[in-house]
Amino acid sequence: MKISEKEVQHVAHLSRLHLDQDELASMTEQLDGILSYMEKLAEVDTEGVLPTTHAFSKTNAFREDIVKDSLSQEESLANGPVQNGTAFQVPRVI
């Protein structure tokens, strides 16, 4: 599939991208290469190949949840410069 500069310019406009003439030519060439490769992939016979979501078997390594002692609330709050009761006080961002 050949893509034209006009089509690339249209997509750039929809994406709110400004492309100068050099960028437009480069992008057209790159997209044309990508679409040509996609056409080659479409020609591959995948009949009888099971669909997969991962190239390898994905397994989760679960561990048992074990409750451990950690810092108390007072010890945790001691690490912050300003506390407000039971929480850190930070400057307003918005």
UniProtKB/Swiss-Prot annotation:
UniProt keyword annotation of Protein transport present: no
Signal sequence range: none
Catalytic reaction list: L-glutamyl-tRNA(Gln) + L-glutamine + ATP + H2O = L-glutaminyl-tRNA(Gln) + L-glutamate + ADP + phosphate + H(+); L-aspartyl-tRNA(Asn) + L-glutamine + ATP + H2O = L-asparaginyl-tRNA(Asn) + L-glutamate + ADP + phosphate + 2 H(+)
Biological processes, Gene Ontology terms: glutaminyl-tRNAGln biosynthesis via transamidation; regulation of translational fidelity; translation
Keywords assigned: ATP-binding, Ligase, Nucleotide-binding, Protein biosynthesis
Enzyme class name: ligase
Molecular functions per Gene Ontology: asparaginyl-tRNA synthase (glutamine-hydrolyzing) activity; ATP binding; glutaminyl-tRNA synthase (glutamine-hydrolyzing) activity
EC number: 6.3.5.-
Pfam families (alphabetical): GatC
HAMAP family for the chain: GatC
Family: Belongs to the GatC family.
Biological role: Allows the formation of correctly charged Asn-tRNA(Asn) or Gln-tRNA(Gln) through the transamidation of misacylated Asp-tRNA(Asn) or Glu-tRNA(Gln) in organisms which lack either or both of asparaginyl-tRNA or glutaminyl-tRNA synthetases. The reaction takes place in the presence of glutamine and ATP through an activated phospho-Asp-tRNA(Asn) or phospho-Glu-tRNA(Gln).
Subunit structure and binding partners: Heterotrimer of A, B and C subunits.
NCBIfam families, per the entry: gatC (TIGR00135)
Protein name as catalogued: Aspartyl/glutamyl-tRNA(Asn/Gln) amidotransferase subunit C
Lineage: Bacteria, Pseudomonadati, Thermodesulfobacteriota, Desulfobulbia, Desulfobulbales
Gene: gatC
